[in-house]
């Protein structure tokens, strides 16, 4: 059962407009989704904010998102606010997302953190298809719960999967399962006393492993590391006791990359 009359759907397709910047070619959405028109905070980089006009995801909510980033587009997709997963009772909420990034296109997918409330159960599956010349920044930040209420790891279960393919060949797979019933999530191999977790993947981005490591080490209150994945792409994983240090670290990395790849129009 879905809270809405139908499965919540979002479709977005972009292309290069007459002025050489990324524009929306086609879009479609059902409640609670909405899209803001693109704006251009820096040069030829477009930014589109994804809106969800709802208090958060409930039991039975199912989201189906398909994003097609056209060739040569440079796009940053952000969200409106922190995403809340409410008590799903004996059910769960889910999201299926498919992203295609075209030739010579750049996508920075930068949503706000996800907060699972007490007894929340969430399933997320993301598949990203790239070309050899595509560039990608993709991240998720997961919070231990409503930290201000000291509601830590009281959710039911959280399971997210991320698959990235380049020219139809898999280059990255992440399978995150957080289940407080079966695992002590505060142990030193998991959150180790921290409350916020960042997973950031960088594909074909102009950044060296040593540079990413230096930014992590300079970030106050952040415990993290960076490693190389297939074809020298990078994956950053970090922990903190608040969202701001992780958002700030992510923004520093993204800003450095966009300053390199964007150009004046």
From Swiss-Prot:
Sorted UniProt keywords: Chaperone, Cytoplasm, Nickel insertion
The organism of origin for this protein: Helicobacter pylori (strain Shi470)
Main location: cytoplasm
Function recorded in the entry: Required for maturation of urease via the functional incorporation of the urease nickel metallocenter.
Protein name, UniProt field: Urease accessory protein UreH
Keyword Aminoacyl-tRNA synthetase belongs to the record: no
Cellular component per GO, a single term: cytoplasm
Encoding gene (name): ureH
Keyword flag Chaperone: yes
GO molecular function, one term: nickel cation binding
Places the protein is found: Cytoplasm
Pfam families per the UniProt record, alphabetical: UreD
Subunit and partners: UreH, UreF and UreG form a complex that acts as a GTP-hydrolysis-dependent molecular chaperone, activating the urease apoprotein by helping to assemble the nickel containing metallocenter of UreC. The UreE protein probably delivers the nickel.
InterPro entries in the record: UreD
Protein family (similarity comment): Belongs to the UreD family.
